[in-house]
UniProtKB/Swiss-Prot annotation:
A Gene Ontology term for the protein's cellular component: cytoplasm
SUPFAM superfamilies per the UniProt record, alphabetical: Glutathione synthetase ATP-binding domain-like (SSF56059), PreATP-grasp domain (SSF52440)
Protein name: D-alanine--D-alanine ligase
Subcellular location: Cytoplasm
The UniProt record lists the keyword Transit peptide: no
Listed GO MF terms: ATP binding; D-alanine-D-alanine ligase activity; metal ion binding
Protein role: Cell wall formation.
Biological process, per Gene Ontology: cell wall organization; peptidoglycan biosynthetic process; regulation of cell shape
Organism: Methylobacterium radiotolerans (strain ATCC 27329 / DSM 1819 / JCM 2831 / NBRC 15690 / NCIMB 10815 / 0-1)
Amino acid sequence: MSKHVAVLLGGTSAEREVSLNSGKACADALEGEGYRVTRVDVGPDIASVLTALRPDAAFNALHGPDGEDGTIQGLLEILKIPYTHSGVLASALAMNKERAKTVMRAAGVDVPEGRIVNRREAARTHPLPPPYVVKPIAEGSSVGVIIVRDGRSHPPQILASEEWTFGEQVLAEPYIAGRELTCGVMGDKALGVIEVKAATGDWYDYDAKYAPGGSVHVLPAELKPNVYQRVQELSLTAHQALGCRGVSRADLRYDDTPGGTGLLVVLEVNTQPGMTQTSLVPEMAAHAGLSFGELVRWMVEDASLNR
């Protein structure tokens, strides 16, 4: 009998649409690989739904709070349902950007400097000299990220408004010029390195990530061999330091601008990277010789408890 896999998708976070797309792609691919699949749009009744289903494994295609912060992982541990991706602690750590930086820094991974400030304080006075970046402590997909350009006289006022729904504390970091790099990790191996370029502008924001034609992916990234290898080493070290399992993706900045610092830093580790057939990790896996179906099959067969 084929293995029964519950694909967890949707949810209620700001990344719901991304999760629906990831979940559909993974569910379709798993059916193509011969698994019996149930698509589960996650809501408040998720515990009773999974208790009734009793799947052999859960494929976690959720993004954002509740899906990649240790919450759903803890529930799956309680229900004794093996699941994909990282466990409770690694998920919670990686979702909190400042705490993740503390752990990565202790493991020798270069990360940006920065400080946590109250959002209203950051709307009154610049928390850092411009240019700098303000971001929610626990969101993904560039949701809520603001770049404050050099020469801007006033801090971003949206931080003091009711429109800001991403928490009272924000993370401010110096803006690092240069290139946006990303590297996936699968098990104990780093995949290829992609340079991501926004089709318009100089920032890889939510629209650049998900709108058709919003970005250009250069794979393999055109880097000196030693830099390429260093990106892979940093990504794998960050994955291991945070205790990640299965598949993750590290996002980095590399300042190779004329007269620049040469700085190479890990911005964050995504424990639930996008999983459509055109997402970054599947693209890296394909470059390494793995089809999308083979990738999701590996993830299901890697599923376990106590991750």
